[in-house]
């Protein structure tokens, strides 16, 4: 489990015991939890993460979200079959990991989705409309059948994920991952969505800033669309 965290210690104190509780309840699952911290994280914070049963990892070379995921992926042990990513702010329900792991043999990516039957979100109507529109545009342009491409709560095959090259620095890296995996897998790329409830964070404020957030998504969409149109047909 890879969890990027940026000043989220109060949320992690509540989240990590819940994550461990779910993982320990699943028969035959041997898991590690990596919390990817900014480079300036204090020794005391890293120690507390360890006490909470997770391994602290410092993101490199920058404190961006993209580098946080790349640093976490690189640190996952090679014996692992899967990597689950989830946010550190408590917005993702750890209990959904049970459904994700159960669906793993059927998919290249398992998505904990807000927008399938049984899924839901605490976001406002405006944010829900923006999110659904974003996901619809990305799915259509990149040829990916998925209602919730933009969520960071996903399960990937470790071998596939560590093989692709990722460039994005911001939260748009989540969509880039899906595109790169689809490129690698071709027409057989399989996505399974399981329902998840997205709740508002309890402590702190979001690190997403609307202006840069939208701009990075637009730039990434245009770049990936260009690459998608240039890639040769398979088969």
Enumerate the language-model features and the residues they cover.
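Hydrophobic targeting segments
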Residues: 1-3, 12, 19, 31-35
């Amino acid at each position: 489990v890879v969890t990027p965290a940026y000043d989220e210690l109060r949320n992690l104190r509540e989240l990590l015991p819940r994550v461990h509780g779910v993982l320990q309840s699943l028969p035959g699952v041997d898991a590690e939890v990596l919390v990817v911290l900014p480079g300036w994280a204090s020794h005391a914070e890293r120690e507390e993460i360890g006490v909470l049963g997770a391994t602290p990892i410092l993101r490199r070379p920058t404190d961006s979200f993209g580098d946080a995921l790349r640093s976490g992926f690189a640190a996952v042990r090679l014996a692992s079959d899967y990597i689950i990513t989830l946010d550190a702010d408590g917005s993702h329900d750890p209990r959904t990991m049970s459904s994700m792991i159960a669906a793993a043999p059927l998919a290249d990516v398992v998505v904990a989705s807000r927008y399938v039957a049984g899924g839901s979100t605490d976001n406002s109507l405006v944010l829900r409309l923006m999110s659904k529109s974003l996901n619809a545009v990305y799915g259509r342009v990149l040829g990916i059948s998925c209602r919730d491409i933009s969520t960071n709560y996903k399960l990937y095959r470790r071998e596939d994920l560590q093989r692709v090259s990722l460039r994005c620095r911001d939260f748009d890296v989540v969509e880039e991952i899906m595109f790169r995996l689809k490129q690698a897998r071709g027409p057989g790329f399989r996505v399974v969505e399981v329902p998840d409830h997205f709740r508002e964070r309890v402590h702190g404020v979001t690190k997403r800033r609307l202006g840069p957030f939208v701009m990075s998504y637009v730039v990434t969409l245009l770049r990936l669309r260009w690459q998608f149109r240039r890639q040769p047909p398979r088969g």
